[in-house]
Amino acid sequence: NFNILEEMYKEFKNGSHIVAASRFIKGGSMKGCPFIKSVLVRSASFTLYYLSSIPIKDASNGFRLFSRKLLNEVNIESKVGFAYSLELLAKCNRLKYKITEIPAQWEERSEGSSRFKVFKWLPQYLKWYIYGLSTTWLRKKKI
């Protein structure tokens, strides 16, 4: 949903380094998603929000605005899928970058096939999920 770009830009102009489109806050939605995908993305986002210091409720949505400063300073290691979005979120949270979210509506594609490869991407997602949790629980600072 590209209609939210203006709102994302406003958040960026207010000092945010990451502005995340969120399906799981008031005004956001996720429609037509396969059951297993829905359970996985909701569970990961819910637990990261409540068990870590990551300040957004939709950690797995890759539709985000990133500041140039962030992209110049944070090394992206992820090689598969949308793992980069979780990686950047976890690393930037450790570095105390300002992270905000705005509501977004998301609908499963009606044409073509999904590029979501859960079993292929899961190891990378788990790596950055644990990295995000360790920021809070193990007080790790190393990037």
Each PLM stretch: what is its role?
Residues 2-82, 108-119, 123-127:
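Acceptor/aglycone-binding surface of glycosyltransferases and processive sugar-polymer synthases
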Residues 46, 50, 95, 136:
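Phosphate/oxyanion-binding loops and surfaces in catalytic or ligand/nucleic-acid-binding neighborhoods
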Residues 56-58, 96-106:
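Catalytic beta-strand/loop signature of glycosyltransferases that borders the donor
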Residues 67, 92, 102:
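Residue-level signature of catalytic and energy-coupling elements of molecular machines
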Residues 84-91:
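Short active-site alpha-helical segment characteristic of glycosyltransferases
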Residues 93-94, 121-122, 137-138:
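Juxtamembrane/interface motifs at transmembrane-helix termini
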Residues 128-143:
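C-terminal, non-catalytic tails of nucleotide-sugar-dependent glycosyltransferases
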